[in-house]
């Protein structure tokens, strides 16, 4: 299961975020299911994903889709393609971790926020240390290569880059936070609202 937070079109065209949750078979990366929360354009993306499921597509197939692009309707790389890219990374051994797992295991994790200090000040994952991506290589020299590490950014892309940096430096247990800080903050708000109702 993975989460992808991407806009339906570019920001300069008043793009609005959508959250795609996709389920892949971990043995063959076949797409098994998907859900999308968002505004305009979610119907297009869920139709593409439903068709992909019907034809037995896997993560790599999504990654290589050639979908129509025009700024009023989509980003250069469609959110469906990013979903395939994330799924493809996972099948190649890149591990993800959910917000729920981060909260449960918080004391056992080294959580690295690779965003800017300004973004970190606005909000961040509880217990995180701010190490901007450009400083990660030098900071990594101070870390235990066997420690369980979580990297994250706003939505997952830079967190994945940080994960790759650490893996290439020989770190053994590096996880990228699924959906990044946006997904984590949404999950926390949902838990607070749920407790209020109970």
Language-model region placement:
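Hydrophobic "anchor" residues
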Residues: 30-31
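Anionic group-transfer/hydrolysis microenvironments
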Residues: 23, 115-117
